[in-house]
Amino acid sequence: MAKLTKRARMIAEKVEARDYDVNEAITLLKELATAKFTESVDVAVNLGIDARKSDQNVRGATVLPNGTGRDVRVAVFTSGDNAEKAKAAGADIVGMEDLAAQVKKGEMNFDVVVASPDAMRVVGQLGQILGPRGLMPNPKTGTVTPDVATAVKNAKAGQVRYRNDKNGIVHATIGRVDFDNDKLKENLEALLAALKKAKPSSAKGVFVKRISLSTTMGAGVSIDQATVAAV
């Protein structure tokens, strides 16, 4: 408990209730990241949408220019030539009914699921298993596609999927504390650019209302939007 108290005290002393220049914020977060593992750097973006309205929900995916720092395992539901293309692109597991049987047994050693359109007849039976885990393939995130090879490459390259929660906030990981500041900023700006492009036509007023950065075990730091190029 003493360690938690010490960490909380350090955060309270160093984090001010103001908007930080993005570079200053990243430097501060790194200073506060004292966990015994390499912490992720996460962003929360408050959007000016009414999340209760389906036509204002924001969902999609984008490849971060510097990746996320994670090794991503990709499972692909497909067959024939597409199966060979998926393997060549780096897929970790490829199959159809055999892969579905593994999932039903609870054997899910993967982080992303991709499916070709013809495989959705098989994947559709797994909705209650994959859905709650955020693994269900979806055309909006590019994970239901005839071009499974590109989807695999994107996932391996550091693609992040985003979706607003019930409060209209998008949460995503943009890297780790051992990334250079410039790389984290580039990743943040790439995500913000993707969100801006995904703005629903029915959303009125200010779209990006607030941006805050945090690490896995750290406090949130509010970002001055004028210091981020994509906003």
From Swiss-Prot:
Record's keyword annotation contains Repressor: yes
Pfam families: Ribosomal_L1
Gene Ontology CC terms: cytosolic large ribosomal subunit
Gene3D superfamilies assigned: 3.30.190.20, 3.40.50.790
PROSITE patterns: RIBOSOMAL_L1
Protein keywords: Repressor, Ribonucleoprotein, Ribosomal protein, RNA-binding, rRNA-binding, Translation regulation, tRNA-binding
Recorded GO MF terms: rRNA binding; structural constituent of ribosome; tRNA binding
Biological process according to GO: regulation of translation; translation
PANTHER family: 54S RIBOSOMAL PROTEIN L1, MITOCHONDRIAL (PTHR36427), LARGE RIBOSOMAL SUBUNIT PROTEIN UL1M (PTHR36427:SF3)
SUBUNIT field: Part of the 50S ribosomal subunit.
Family note: Belongs to the universal ribosomal protein uL1 family.
Entry function: Binds directly to 23S rRNA. The L1 stalk is quite mobile in the ribosome, and is involved in E site tRNA release. Protein L1 is also a translational repressor protein, it controls the translation of the L11 operon by binding to its mRNA.
Listed name of the protein: Large ribosomal subunit protein uL1
